[in-house]
Curated annotation (Swiss-Prot):
It comes from Caldicellulosiruptor saccharolyticus (strain ATCC 43494 / DSM 8903 / Tp8T 6331). Keywords: Cell cycle, Cell division, Cell membrane, Cell shape, Cell wall biogenesis/degradation, Glycosyltransferase, Membrane, Peptidoglycan synthesis, Transferase. It is found in: Cell membrane. Pfam families: Glyco_tran_28_C, Glyco_transf_28. One of its GO terms (biological process) is peptidoglycan biosynthetic process. Transmembrane segments: none annotated. GO terms for molecular function: UDP-N-acetyl-D-glucosamine:N-acetylmuramoyl-L-alanyl-D-glutamyl-meso-2,6-diaminopimelyl-D-alanyl-D-alanine-diphosphoundecaprenol 4-beta-N-acetylglucosaminlytransferase activity; undecaprenyldiphospho-muramoylpentapeptide beta-N-acetylglucosaminyltransferase activity. The lineage of its organism: Bacteria, Bacillati, Bacillota, Bacillota incertae sedis, Caldicellulosiruptorales. GO terms for cellular component: plasma membrane. Its EC number is 2.4.1.227. This is UDP-N-acetylglucosamine--N-acetylmuramyl-(pentapeptide) pyrophosphoryl-undecaprenol N-acetylglucosamine transferase.
Length: 370
């Protein structure tokens, strides 16, 4: 470490939902300070091993594995890896000597936070979802600050005096397009665009529901569907569309690499309820129909979706309801009821926290100046 250099450690991983917010904060701080040494701690099995280096940051690896919810002998291996990871985190933190540790959840963050506590290093916790994960619940008991993305999260943390509602950081590129230019770039200036996204891996039931929906709206020439099916579900989705004879009013893509442009162009979004998706949709004030995934830990996506629904920022359709008329009914309301559309757009904007990264950056500055 150079003289005058300040080190910060970020840790969180497993999924993009834990990693991208940390990267967004790191990017913000890097622009504000020219004397920062930013280091991530993760596992070489999680997505952080790809995402962090792609963004130009150093990453150090420790051993860690997620706890199995049921009683199983595999948890012995989890415990042994945890002990090993804790010791590795201690060695890394002793060497780097960070002024602050910022953890965003996932099983890798717990040994890092505990090591920071042992070394009396200030720790800031960020929770992206309405329902906190197990690691974050434990870390919240001893960290200095608990930053949340949803007001509803506050009730799950006992130390409410440490809780600050900041929102979930989103990448700056999300704000780089205006709606008219984005629509024009897609050749869809005169269309009501319904963007449907089932996550990076796709969602078979959601894909089929959206394709059936596009078939029912074929007579409505103003409405155009764009479906991001997921790489592994792409051929299946195309074949299903062909079997229904759907062609003219839907574009099926395996993956959307330029999501900021497509999201800007969209009038209505149909999406899962992952933390990043919710944050980006609301940051742009998009009315949405949210279909929470039932295949996630603690059913946290449904908590996220209900938090939006509570303030009128979205409609919620459960996975089990996809074959009902609910999805079609909600879409018709958003297309044909302009007053409802405007109200939901306004509620979405109020729910969104486009300034989340700056909010977190200001809290960091308090600790960096100590």
């Amino acid at each position: 470490m150079n003289s005058g250099e300040i080190s910060i450690v970020f840790s969180g991983g497993g999924t993009g939902g834990h990693i991208y917010p940390a990267v967004a904060v790191a990017d913000y701080l890097k622009k504000r300070y020219n004397n920062l040494n930013i280091v991530f701690i993760g596992t070489n099995e999680g997505l952080e091993s790809k995402i962090v280096p792609q963004h130009g940051y150093k990453i150090e690896y420790i051993q860690a594995k997620g706890l199995k919810r049921s009683l199983t002998v595999k948890n012995v291996e989890v415990f042994l890896k945890f002990i090993s990871g804790y010791r590795q985190a201690l060695q890394i933190l002793k060497r780097i000597k960070p002024k602050v540790v910022f953890v965003t959840g996932g099983y890798v963050s717990l040994p890092v936070a505990l090591a920071a506590r042992r070394l009396k290093i200030k720790t800031i916790l960020h929770e992206q979802n309405a329902y906190p994960g197990l690691a974050n619940k434990i870390i919240s008991r001893f960290c200095e600050k608990i930053l949340i993305s949803f007001e509803e999260s506050k009730r799950f943390f006992k130390n409410s005096n440490k809780v600050v509602l900041t929102g979930n950081p989103v990448r700056l590129e999300i704000f780089s397009h205006n709606e008219r230019a984005a629509k024009s770039s897609l050749g869809l200036e005169d269309k009501i665009i319904v963007l449907a996204v089932g996550g990076s891996r796709g969602a078979e039931n959601l894909n089929k529901a959206v394709i059936r929906l596009s078939k029912e709206f074929e007579g409505c020439k103003d409405v155009y569907f764009i479906l991001s099916s997921g790489d592994t579900k792409y051929l299946e989705a195309v074949n299903f569309a062909n079997s229904l004879g759907v062609k003219s009013n839907i574009k099926i893509l395996p993956y959307i690499s330029d999501m900021p442009r497509y999201l800007a162009a969209a009038d209505i979004v149909i999406s899962r309820a992952g933390a990043i998706a919710i944050s980006e949709i609301t940051a742009l004030g998009k009315p949405s129909i949210i279909v929470p995934s039932p295949y996630v830990a603690n059913n946290h996506q449904e908590y996220n979706a209900k938090a939006l629904e509570k303030v009128g920022a979205c409609f919620v359709v459960l996975e089990s309801e996809l074959e009902s008329d609910k999805l079609k009914s909600f879409l018709e309301k958003l297309i044909y009821d302009k007053a409802l559309y405007e109200r939901m757009s306004e509620s979405s904007k109020k729910m969104g926290k486009p300034e989340a990264t700056q909010n977190i950056g200001k809290i960091f500055e308090e600790y960096l100046s100590l």
